[in-house]
Amino acid sequence: LGAGTFMAISVFDLFRIGIGPSSSHTVGPMRAARDFVMALTAPKVSRVVVRLHGSLAATGVGHGTDNAVVIGLMGETPEAVDLDTIAERLAALDNSEPLRLPNGQALAFQRARDIEWDEACLPFHPNAMVLTAYEGDTVISTNTYYSLGGGFYVDQACADRGGLDEDKTALPYPFESANELLTLCQQHGLSISELMLENEKAWRSEAAIRDELLTIWHAMRQSIDNGLEATGRLPGGLNVRRRAHSLHQQLLSPPDNQRLIVTSFTVMDWVNLFALAVNEENAAGKRMVTAPTNGAAGIVPAVLAYYLKFEPDACDADVVNFLLTAGAMGILCKKNASISGAEVGCQGEVGSACAMAAAGLAEVLGGTPKQVENAAEIGLEHNLGLTCDPVAGVAQVPCIKRDAIA
């Protein structure tokens, strides 16, 4: 992995609690829409128009982009919105009830009229959306946003400066490439998780870092548990049946002739199961953690859940070290390549997540920094070439099984 322009990225920029089915097509647009209306200063807004471009338009229906934008215009955030109220609020809007902005102002909003779909890509990124606010026929505010994957987004001003709105936080151990990371670990006698912990202290205390990482893990664990319990078929029109629940029951009660067979393949069944559970929850639009995206959100929690289930001495400290190390690899992918499926294909999502999970596992198993980096490299290269080609634009086929395979 080569070097790029320095910017400070936190592990908490990669692991974010949000909702499914897509970090780039659901989480990012919701955040961007909220950002737009929160910045409005005009006393009277009569209309807001949203134009979705490129991939947001091409696959936005299947990813619920229009729904996400509407909820964002209401001032909601992916991490805090009450999922049980979304369908009711959208139905009310479609029944001609007004859309209420965060400042309390109500305006008529018709999704068929005020959300436009334009598959033409804008130059900066394939995931683009233009929001315009009117007072009567007069434009009072407009901005263009680009959803970069993983819930990251930038507006046009930031795009004109070249990309991410760079965080200039001074880190004790800044690195732009894997080589730099390994050199720092060797020079200072640190593991990758130890180095990442020191860098994270630039933003928050060690206690806060550990607490927040455990909160992230608990959200991941909850998505696994919810996925194992849920049955039925997934929304989206493909009629895909949830499989995690029935597979879980099979693993808990294997046929008599398999009860005494415990092999590495048995363990892999559990890893596959955990990944399926998470991604079925994601496809259903439930609460998720980007890792580093929603489309690849099953891989990191599945591998971590495997470690905690089958390693007798596993503890909370391992969870923290696993996620810190995984975050380091995600940061390298984000800085030097991309985690956006719309930009570089599924290899950028599933490949990055596989590298992150492999690195985290190698770390908690006692690997040296070089071994951790090698694990990440192997995980990444085995997913090279995967394109982002979901059937009918819905994050289900082949997305769910790709997580299990990775």
Regions found by a protein language model. Give the residues of each.
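Alpha-helical support elements that line or immediately flank enzyme active sites
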Residues: 24-39, 301-313, 358-366
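C-terminal regulatory domains involved in ligand/effector binding and gene-expression control
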Residues: 75-259, 270
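Hydrophobic alpha-helical bundle architecture
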Residues: 314, 325, 332-403
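Conserved phosphate/anionic-ligand binding catalytic regions in large, soluble enzymes, centered on
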Residues: 15-33, 283-303, 346-355
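Non-transmembrane, aqueous-exposed alpha-helical and coiled segments at domain scale
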Residues: 6-8, 12-19, 30-52, 63, ...
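Short, mixed-charge aromatic SLiMs
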Residues: 47-60, 92-99, 323-336, 377-390
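C-terminal domain-closing interface element
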Residues: 70-89, 118, 358, 363, ...
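Accessory "access/gating" subregions that flank catalytic or transport cores
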Residues: 207-345
